[in-house]
Amino acid sequence: REKPDFKKFLITMGGVDRHNITEMVLEELRNCDLPAEVEVIIVMGVTSPYIESVRRKIKSLPFTAEIKSNVTNMAELMANSDIAIGASGATTWERCCLGLPSIQITVAQNQTVIADYISKAGAALSVTVDQLNQLKSRIIILKQQIKDMAKKSAEVTNGSGLIQVLRYLK
């Protein structure tokens, strides 16, 4: 990320997003006074119980938003995004591998260890579902720290996890 920008957002809360956090995030983004040229890509599974509700929501937003389902190019979507807002699950490591500055949302108890580690490393900003009203202030901070956060995020992983696991299994 030589020249980090602030125009392409990626939102991914897991395939099912059973608590409709995606829609909550979109509502908070509406209140962030984002530039009109901002583009938001939302990755959701087709089995998400809220996908139609999110489709309706994006029609009323002051910025462009699009839902993508059954994606086979997640790494490409991440590489083409300037920031991500996502659950603090396994995708966190993928965002770090690509040096993608992020706001991570802890949506399950088992994600707190990852969220704490990534936050302390300076690789992402963290909020819980109960703190979504702080998204606007986190976006302001992220915008100011985007280049540094991209660097720290990329430092979290060396991108060769599969090779390391295979060596361990031998």
Give the positions of each predicted feature:
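Nucleotide-activated sugar donor-binding and catalytic core shared by glycosyltransferases
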Residues: R1-K170
